[in-house]
Amino acid sequence: MADLVKKHFYKITLTIPEEFQEMSSALLSDFPFTGIEDEFDEQSFTIEDVYWDNGNIANQLLSILESTSIPAEIKDIMIIEDQNWNAIWEESLEPVQVNESIVITPIWKAHQIESPIKIIINPQMSFGTGYHSTTRMVCRKLQEYVGANSHWIDAGCGSGVLAILAEKLGASYIYAFDNDEWSIANTKENIHLNNCSSITVEQESIFSINLPQVHGIAANLYRNLLIPNIYKFAKALEDSKGVLIMSGILRFDEQEIIDCAVQHNFIHISTEYEGDWTAITMRYNA
């Protein structure tokens, strides 16, 4: 019997500012990558050698990003041997203690966890695990502001962690949306894992959606998505004079976000910091 040919992969690491990474992932989604890794101001794209095309693919990535004014440069290219990427990645994930009462845990370690509030997820490599510092900060703010029988929006729900937490904290209706079909599928899966029944999930773009009236909004989005849509958040909070919790914001964008929200009749309540990231809480006050 002939030996199986072992696959090789190329890992292309680009320097891309954090606030552009969601957009770059979307723009490059048609390429047959086996994995995408997001780090601070870096993204790595892994592709099988059969698609390498003598290195032309790296220049194609840069050309696409430059055409949309996303600043990017090639930092590193390396050849790596075939591995069980998903198994390696899963082994690296540990339950995350958000605070003394909230834990986010991958499903394969859920049986090890005892916590007043346990959020079980089946993390997906393609769009995030819900473990980012911005998610943790919003979780802590939700614990402050979600009231019994309140209504909430999870804008850009990703894996659905924030929507699930809102229900566990007592919200009776949560509207969660994302423009990514895989995020929607994963959110629905995680809703089922947590036995939630008060969450409505839809695939929608934040630029075209009409938001319902609610008591609060959790928007863990990048600056370029928050600023053009703060007016929508204001409209959704008109009746309740509710709270808007925003994250996905780098420290140097904090004041610009606050100023924009103030122009739409929000008042600033607080700002939290974790590393280079911030979470800003505002209240509608027209």
Describe every region a protein language model picked out.
Residues 85-147:
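SAM-dependent Rossmann-like transferase core, predominantly class I methyltransferases
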Residues 5-113:
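N-terminal auxiliary segments of SAM/dcSAM-dependent transferases
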Residues 29, 164-167, 230, 234-235:
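A structural alpha-helix within SAM-dependent methyltransferase catalytic domains
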Residues 34-35, 73-76, 103, 151, ...:
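Conserved beta-strand segments of alpha/beta enzyme cores
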Residues 179-286:
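S-adenosylmethionine
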Residues 26, 62, 136-139, 143, ...:
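Amphipathic, non-transmembrane alpha-helical secondary structure
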Residues 125, 129-210:
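Conserved SAM/SAH cofactor-binding pocket of Class I
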